[in-house]
């Protein structure tokens, strides 16, 4: 799964968590079911059948019927699966109470975007989402290269585990004390061996950290006791895909395993903040386009959506808590459909639901958060979608100064050549 896919899937889970946490029901009619990857559907089905029998004895008629209904819905969801999916299965079923006091049935089932390590069955007056929150905890893999004048070590750190992938030693000639021609010759030989050593370090790094033309770690840490690490980072022979993933360069007192351990310790803060760093890099890339006035950038909801529909956007950047809604309405007389983009203050504007010419009531076809619509459709336009927070200085500036909505273009677009379809929103144009 690419970093981009993971970013979008994590946003979906965060959104789902917020929705589920806010939901409340009467009695114990809300079922949370989490099944581990290798657990048997048949075992869970039997457990639900037993639970159904137990719930049949609940004294309160209203609560009994609600619980039995939730168990039945859960059983129906399980019938959609012959076996537990590769990453496990999450099911939420039940009847919740809406803000206006009405009952609403909720039935959700999905395979998580990565293996889930929890088993859970709870029938309560709320949904339990701790297992989903665990999915959002980082399990990124970080690559380490420890390089000095004695050799190189390649390792990875993932969570609390570390692994040495490869190590090799080198015997580089020391500086020679002779003068004249001998000194020049030895200096040349020493530089040649040093260059060959760095080439081997760089080529081995490509072998270790690139799989199927994709970097297989979230970030790289270079460490060492001499200048080798800096030379490697700046060298043309170091794969640029890896160079772009360098998170930190640290000085360590040792090589080998001791150097690896020291490098992990010295880079711990950077590893914890890697998503923060990735976000800063992403937004800085957008700011650079703006500062250089390349014309290959866009911001503001209307122009950005125009560019998206034209297929001109390469990278779409969206603040994760954007509150804009996308509303599709239809004139029942003419059949004409129209799209409105509404800010939170405009979402109860009754004029949007009436034909401006005839005053006729318009039918609402769809109301979706714009973020949700983008998640469902961005791939149709060949764009990459990245959600960002406003927790970094760059993220905060992007949200406040650019409306939290913009993109980097594949090519320049002159928006004056295109009619603005909707200008109801977009104070950032």
UniProtKB/Swiss-Prot annotation:
Q: Which residues cross the membrane?
A: none
Q: Any idea where this protein resides?
A: Cytoplasm
Tell me the domain of life: Eukaryota
Matching entries from SUPFAM superfamilies are given as: L30e-like, N-terminal domain of eukaryotic peptide chain release factor subunit 1, ERF1, Translational machinery components
Q: Which GO terms describe its cellular component?
A: cytoplasm
Main localization is cytoplasm
Q: Which InterPro entries match?
A: eFR1_2_sf, eRF1_1_Pelota, eRF1_1_sf, eRF1_2, eRF1_3, Peptide_chain-rel_eRF1/aRF1, Ribosomal_eL30-like_sf
GO MF annotation list: translation release factor activity
What the entry lists under SMART domains is as follows:
eRF1_1
Q: Does the keyword Protein biosynthesis apply?
A: yes
| Swiss-Prot/TrEMBL keywords | Cytoplasm, Protein biosynthesis
Q: Name one Pfam family in it.
A: eRF1_3
General function of this protein:
Directs the termination of nascent peptide synthesis (translation) in response to the termination codons UAA, UAG and UGA.
Protein family: Belongs to the eukaryotic release factor 1 family.
Q: How does it assemble?
A: Heterodimer of two subunits, one of which binds GTP.
Q: What is the name of the protein in this document?
A: Eukaryotic peptide chain release factor subunit 1
Organism for this UniProt entry: Cryptosporidium hominis
């Amino acid at each position: 799964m690419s970093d981009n896919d993971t970013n979008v899937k994590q946003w979906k889970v965060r959104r789902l968590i917020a929705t589920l946490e806010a939901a409340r029901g009467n009695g114990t009619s809300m079922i949370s079911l989490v099944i581990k990857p290798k657990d048997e559907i048949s075992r869970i089905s039997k457990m639900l059948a037993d639970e159904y029998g137990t719930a049949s004895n609940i004294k309160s008629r209203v609560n009994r019927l609600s619980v039995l209904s939730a168990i039945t819905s859960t059983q129906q969801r399980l019938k959609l699966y012959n076996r537990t999916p590769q990453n496990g299965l999450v099911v939420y079923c039940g009847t919740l109470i809406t803000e206006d006091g009405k009952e609403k049935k909720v039935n959700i089932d999905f395979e998580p975007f990565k293996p889930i390590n929890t088993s859970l069955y709870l029938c309560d007056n709320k949904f339990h989402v701790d297992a989903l929150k665990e999915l959002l905890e980082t399990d990124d893999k970080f690559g380490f290269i420890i390089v000095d004048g004695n050799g190189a070590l390649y390792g990875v750190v993932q969570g609390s585990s570390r692994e040495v992938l490869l190590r090799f030693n080198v015997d580089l000639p020391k500086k020679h004390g002779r003068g004249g021609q001998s000194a020049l010759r030895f200096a040349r030989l020493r530089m040649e061996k040093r260059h060959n050593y760095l080439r081997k370090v760089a080529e081995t790094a490509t072998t270790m950290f690139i799989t199927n033309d994709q970097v297989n770690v979230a970030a790289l840490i270079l460490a060492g006791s001499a200048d080798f690490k800096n030379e490697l980072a700046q060298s043309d022979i170091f794969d640029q895909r890896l160079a772009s993933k360098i998170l930190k360069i640290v000085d360590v007192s040792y090589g080998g395993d001791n150097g690896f351990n020291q490098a992990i310790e010295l880079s711990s803060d950077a590893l914890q903040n890697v998503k923060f760093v990735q976000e800063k890099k992403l937004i800085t890339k957008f700011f650079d386009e703006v500062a250089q006035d390349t014309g290959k950038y866009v911001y503001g909801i209307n122009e950005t959506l125009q560019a998206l529909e034209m297929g001109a956007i390469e990278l779409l950047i969206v603040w994760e808590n954007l509150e804009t809604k996308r509303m599709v309405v239809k004139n029942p007389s003419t059949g004409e459909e129209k799209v409105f983009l509404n800010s939170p203050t405009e979402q109860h504007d009754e004029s949007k639901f009436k034909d401006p010419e005839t005053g006729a009531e318009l039918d609402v076809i769809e109301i979706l958060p714009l973020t949700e619509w983008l998640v469902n459709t961005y791939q149709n336009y060949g764009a990459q979608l990245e959600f960002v927070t406003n927790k970094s200085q760059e993220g905060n500036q992007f949200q406040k100064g650019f409306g939290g909505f913009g993109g980097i273009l594949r090519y320049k677009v002159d928006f004056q050549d295109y009619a603005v379809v909707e200008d109801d929103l977009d104070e950032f144009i």
